[in-house]
Amino acid sequence: MRQNPDIEISLVGEEATIDLGAKLALNLRAGDCISLIGDLGAGKTTLSRGLIQAILGADTEVPSPTYTIVQTYETDPAPIWHFDLYRIESPHELIELGFEDAEDDIMVIEWPENAGSLLPSQRLIVELIFTDNGRSARLTGTTPEWKQRLNDIFDRS
């Protein structure tokens, strides 16, 4: 059963997806997990790029980790682990990649459903959906803290 999103916003153009990533970046803390859900081409890597470049600068190269599975970035307050689990066939593969080591840092996970039971339960879920006008993003916090942070980010109470 799908939970109703806390926030739903329209993303018209690639820049809007990058801007959403940048907004989320300003509120990240050590131990955070953001799971990105969406079809191929929905904007998961674009959102990740916006998030990482908002912290490290627009010149920072942020490639898709489709083939490397994970890219890490040294940031303050904690390193960011950008995972793309599209090619993962079993959650056991993630243990070899240090997935559990990343839980105290910041995790941004594309194709999180492939993590199985290793996926942290306390996370922000960002679902990117194709629409007639481009894309939309549905953001759902799995904890009261995430719900409050979403309200703060988007000036809602």
Please tell me what each predicted stretch does.
Residues 25-31:
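Phosphate-binding P-loop
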Residues 62, 66, 70-113:
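Conserved nucleotide-sensing/catalytic segment adjacent to the nucleotide-binding pocket
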Residues 40:
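The conserved Walker
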Residues 7, 90, 97-157:
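Short phosphate-coordinating micro-motif centered on Lys-Gly-acidic
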Residues 44:
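Conserved lysine of the Walker
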Residues 2-21:
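N-terminal pre-Walker A segment at the start of P-loop NTPase domains
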Residues 34-36:
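Hydrophobic anchor at the beta1->P-loop junction of P-loop NTPases
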